[in-house]
């Protein structure tokens, strides 16, 4: 495997990056971080990915792996763990930019596969580990360690170690079938249980659960303040979506078809991520030894 970088807005750079390779794993999926209208976010995300797919069409690639998101899968109406098969019949009603972007990119990937590109979708669940800049899921560890996490919204999640997710994506590239999704799943946990594990690891008090409607009001106020020139919101729409719109996940398909089994526990994943954050100056509070 070889890591290459290219700007998704630069088609020539993408084509040059893909020279002399026979497969590509795209780990640059768009992630809304700063408040913008959801339609603008979707337009940007799809345009960038279309540049990627257009570059791929000119090359003899045997596999293209899009790194998807579990939120793009509709929840099981019976409450059972979700799997790869369900697909929204229409655009999701909730206008969360994160949900809308990930749904649109999932649909785009499936469409490209139907049009003949060898696109396979690998979907790691909520990921913790090293080499995280801390602006997505790693924020839960960083902010709780720094005593700056305002609270959490309860919900259902599946959590996997980043290294295991990486191995899984390689297996998707090696053995996944074009046009198929593969969930790379770890442990099913409520957000309350997950935040509790993080709190124990960093030696911080357990933060309070925030009702979903309260979190949305806080996010709306902070977004309004940001648009008037204030600081970036701490309670973002994307963070609320990550916490509240998830579901437990069934990873049986990847186990059967790819032989994928996670090896690192959630506790170890949190500890490894924390050590990396400490070593890179992202955690500043004094921690429990």
Where are these regions (language model features)?
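Conserved beta-loop-beta element that borders a ligand/cofactor-binding pocket
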Residues: 68, 107-130
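Mid/C-terminal beta-alpha module of Rossmann-like enzyme folds, strongest
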Residues: 168-234, 251, 256, 265-288
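Conserved Rossmann-fold NAD(P)-dependent oxidoreductase catalytic core, especially the SDR/UDP-sugar
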Residues: 44-97
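NAD(P)H-binding glycine-rich loop region in Rossmannoid oxidoreductase-like domains
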Residues: 1-47, 55
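Substrate-positioning beta->alpha
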Residues: 104, 135-136, 153-174, 180
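A conserved pocket-lining segment of Rossmann-fold NAD(P)-dependent short-chain dehydrogenase/reductase
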Residues: 90-92, 140-160, 164
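Conserved catalytic-site region of short-chain dehydrogenase/reductase
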Residues: 33, 70-81, 127-134
